[in-house]
Curated annotation (Swiss-Prot):
UniProt-listed Pfam families: Queuosine_synth (PF02547)
Record keywords, A-Z: Cytoplasm, Queuosine biosynthesis, S-adenosyl-L-methionine, Transferase
Subunit annotation: Monomer.
Chief site of localization: cytoplasm
Pathway(s) it belongs to: tRNA modification; tRNA-queuosine biosynthesis
Cited PANTHER family: S-ADENOSYLMETHIONINE:TRNA RIBOSYLTRANSFERASE-ISOMERASE (PTHR30307:SF0)
An MF annotation (GO) of this entry: S-adenosylmethionine:tRNA ribosyltransferase-isomerase activity
Family membership noted in the UniProt record: Belongs to the QueA family.
Record-given protein name: S-adenosylmethionine:tRNA ribosyltransferase-isomerase
Name of the top EC class for this enzyme: transferase
InterPro entries with a match to the protein in the record: QueA, QueA_dom1, QueA_dom2, QueA_sf
Assigned EC number: 2.4.99.17
Catalytic activity: 7-aminomethyl-7-carbaguanosine(34) in tRNA + S-adenosyl-L-methionine = epoxyqueuosine(34) in tRNA + adenine + L-methionine + 2 H(+)
């Protein structure tokens, strides 16, 4: 299966660079999996597609202000993007500088703070901060907006590039399908008899990395930490028992649930995953999906194609472009019910790299 099969032309004007005034005011494109039928709605119309007894699974990761600016003790400027918090003082980070810092060298952080470069691990640098990492980031860090939002971060991004239910700090990118939900909508979902459960997947900067191979099967995903608790496993089992649907809010929720159901049975899981879901791979847990519009040739678009079917997904994206939907993190959303017999661009039998 070719990566090029997942390309499309997107007008620059459709890239959402700022959030709308209200979270819930986004548009919603619905895609019926069994028929491929599309409907153009508002995000609040999602309530009409939910049934009493359904279970919605959200990712409660919290985005940390992971971008820092500073300089080496020798004077050269640099930019740090924290990829993973290792403990209270140490992180793995991407460092952009004219010359990479050497082990043992000091880094002075703009706004106050100091770090030592401990070691290099392939493309990532292990840094040790003199003070606790999370309070330091809250004090002087910048929100790590995706590269396609080509503007400096603003104060409003601290609130809007964060879900209202975010709890567990550790992500360097938002689980963006969740950005459309405000507290009144969450309450309306509960009032309809829909249950909710929360997984955690700390989204890494690798989510924005392009696929650099020609054949999908040759791609290896970056690793991210996730946790699916026994409470989530029990909630899914109860949903199945009452005949409800498991609705994942975001591709990270899909990847969490499917990572914890490797053998077809959902079990508690805590640890790293590099699961890569693309057309031909079965889904063991998820029945419906809320998701944003994703980048061309991205692994997220491949996941959606695996769920909805390749021709149906590409037709939906063409319709979204024609109707002026806003794309990517601050953009509009889709509600997709699973295609029971999805087709791929060409025959392929993927291996599960999770």
């Amino acid at each position: 299966m070719r990566v090029a099969d997942f390309t499309f032309e997107l007008p620059d004007s459709l890239i959402a660079r700022h959030p709308l005034a209200e979270r819930r005011s986004s548009r919603l494109l619905t895609l019926d999996g069994p028929t491929g039928a599309l409907a153009h709605r508002q995000f609040t119309d999602l309530l009409e597609h939910l049934r009493s007894g359904d279970l919605m699974v959200f990712n409660n990761t919290r985005v940390i202000p992971a971008r820092l600016f500073g300089q080496k003790a020798s004077g050269g400027k640099l930019e740090i993007l924290v990829e993973r918090v290792l403990d209270s003082h140490r992180v793995l980070a991407h460092v952009r500088a004219s010359k990479s810092p050497k082990p043992g060298s000091s880094i002075l952080i703009d706004g106050g703070g100091e770090a030592e470069m401990v070691a290099r691990h392939d493309a990532l640098f292990e840094l040790r901060f003199a003070e606790e990492v999370l309070p330091l980031l809250d004090r002087v860090g910048h929100m790590p907006l995706p590269p396609y939002i080509d503007r400096p971060d603003e104060g409003a991004d601290r609130e809007r590039y964060q879900t209202v239910y975010a709890q567990r700090a550790g992500a360097v990118a938002a689980p963006t399908a969740g950005l459309h939900f405000d507290q009144p909508l969450m309450e309306a979902i509960a009032a309809k008899g829909v249950e909710t459960a929360f997984v955690t997947l700390h989204v890494g900067a690798g989510t924005f990395q392009p696929v650099r191979v020609e054949q999908i099967e040759d791609h290896h995903m970056h690793s991210e930490w996730l946790e699916v608790s026994q409470d989530v496993v029990d909630a899914v089992a109860a949903c199945r028992a009452r005949g409800g649907r498991v609705i994942a809010v975001g591709t990270t929720s899909v990847r969490s649930l499917e990572s914890a159901a490797r053998d077809g049975q959902l079990k508690p899981f805590s640890g790293d995953t590099d699961i890569f879901i693309y057309p031909g791979r079965p889904f063991h847990v998820v029945d419906a999906l809320v998701t944003n519009f994703h980048l061309p040739e991205s692994t997220l678009l491949m996941l959606v194609s695996a769920f909805a079917g390749y021709p149906e997904t590409m037709a939906a994206y063409a319709a979204a472009i024609e109707h002026g939907y806003r794309f990517f993190s601050y953009g509009d959303a889709m509600f997709i019910t699973r295609n029971p017999a999805p087709t791929a661009p060409q025959e392929s039998a993927p291996e599960d790299h999770a």
